[in-house]
Swiss-Prot record:
PANTHER family membership: 30S RIBOSOMAL PROTEIN S16, SMALL RIBOSOMAL SUBUNIT PROTEIN BS16M
Gene name in the database record: rps16
Source organism of the structure: Agrostis stolonifera (Creeping bentgrass)
Gene Ontology molecular function terms on file: structural constituent of ribosome
Compartment(s): Plastid, Chloroplast
Pfam families registered for this protein in UniProt: Ribosomal_S16 (PF00886)
Family label: Belongs to the bacterial ribosomal protein bS16 family.
Alphabetical list of HAMAP family matching this protein: Ribosomal_bS16
Name of the molecule in the record: Small ribosomal subunit protein bS16c
Amino acid sequence: MVKLRLKRCGRKQQAVYRIVAIDVRSRREGRDLRKVGFYDPIKNQTCLNVPAILYFLEKGAQPTRTVYDILRKAELFKEKERILS
């Protein structure tokens, strides 16, 4: 099973995260299938590869709660409903 989850990057006390599609059995810093976004909680910046995220969601990938909140804040689910209708 594939999940969309955060992968920690950055320096000590200055964490930034990549949003990645990764196998559920892999560890947090393990090998990812594809990088689909970027999230910086300190600067509150988000960069998303929307077509890649929609592709993985359509294939059955489950976002973690934090990634789900990031995607909802970016109004990605409204866009997904608009594309599917």
